[in-house]
């Protein structure tokens, strides 16, 4: 749960920078991405 939930064809709820999208897509594809990495990436 939380802001990083994934949906088909929609990788994230929050606005993400272009550089952040691949990281979120990795998580949506089943990879374990630390939440801190996502926060650091998306809040730049």
UniProtKB/Swiss-Prot annotation:
Post-translational modification as stated in the protein's UniProt record: The disulfide bonds are essential for the inhibitor activity.
Principal subcellular localisation of the protein: secreted
Gene3D superfamilies for the chain: Plant lipid-transfer and hydrophobic proteins
Disulfide bond sites: 20-41
Subcellular location: Secreted
Any one cellular-component term (Gene Ontology): extracellular region
GO function terms (MF aspect): alpha-amylase inhibitor activity; serine-type endopeptidase inhibitor activity
Tissues in which the UniProt entry reports expression: Endosperm.
Quaternary structure note: Homodimer.
Entry function: Alpha-amylase inhibitor.
Protein name: Alpha-amylase inhibitor WDAI-3
Species in which this protein is naturally found: Triticum aestivum (Wheat)
